[in-house]
Amino acid sequence: NEDYIPFFVRPPKEGSKAKIALIIPTNSYMAYANDNLSVNSVVAQLLTGRVPLLQPSDLLLNDYRGYGLGTYTVYRDGWGVNISSRLRPILNMRPKYIHILSPSLWQLNADLHFVDWLHEMNFDVDIHTDEDIQKEGVELLKKYKVVMTGHHPEYITEEAWHAFHDYQMQGGRFMYNAANGYYWICALHPDNHNILEVRKGDNGTRAWTINPGEYCNAFDGKHGGLWRVRGRDMCKLLGVSFTSFGLTYSSYYKRSPDSELSECAWMFEGIGLDEPIGDFGLIGDGAAGLELDRYDLEKGTPHRAFVLAHSEGHNDMFVTVSEDSTFHARGNILNGTGETNPNTRADILYYKTPNDGAVISFSSMTWLGSLSHNKYDNNVSRLMKNVITGFMKDGPLP
């Protein structure tokens, strides 16, 4: 008999001393708002490999349709829902809500793992949302030495894409603590940023497909769908690209040879070379899971990038994303599942950008769920703390 009303408190416009900004992915929260997939999805059990655990809010949404739908559901006529708003009760974006797509947490309540850890580590952090980036752009981001994501910033507008790109090129240090990020094009209503539009067609791992001839957004008239369709694969911002998903048990990382190089070794102080990283966690029992991103030079990974670690041991619930399946043939392992497909992995990637900037990508949606293990004394927590502390320092990185 309890409920929570989430809200985000911005810092004062002047006078904040924080060097770190955490960007809350409110676009993605709107996209998943009231999706009720545990009831509405005909493939829920196939995707997760388990019987859905219904929450009280799922049952409420099933009885009272007036709370509206999310962009992962369809109307009665089969048309995909492509408009969402936050100006209503969003019952699945609440602390303690267990989402059908995750072994435990998803979106807001998974991001709270990170907020908890940042406070536990005594980092001074300012909170901003996607809407703030939409309004203020790179001028807001430039106030911070380090800008960080939550665990699943899947939806990004063109304005925000440019803001993050410009921040990186102007010396900003960017931490992508997620997977399947900056994947779908979205647009906010020009007169009301509380309303989001997405159109899913052409390609992509998606819940529905827009009708032919209707791929362009109503809000800005531009082509919707994947950012890859506009020549802006997420590799261009993050160095990694969405490769696989498995809504089941998670796995761990092993260090790669690049992690021993002088440019990278400082991040791994206190972590053994053969030590599994993140073979524990609150989301699927591991740091590498749900959705995974990989290094891919063909899609835009910078040639100067270092692969610090890669995940392994994923089971056959992990499948290849549809946009990477160009030709289906029996025995083609690149269309296969986790146990046979070498592309089923998460790569921790690091590279430097102009003006002493840098990007690090952890490439897993369950990464942040491993921070608190063993009372915060673990190698995921240690690696994150080393990176943030190093990124906050003035002058060139090693």
Regions of interest found by a model, annotated:
Residues 6, 19-21, 117, 124-126, ...:
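Beta-sheet entry/capping signal
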Residues 191-386, 390-391:
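Glycine-rich, aromatic-lined ligand/substrate-binding cores of catalytic
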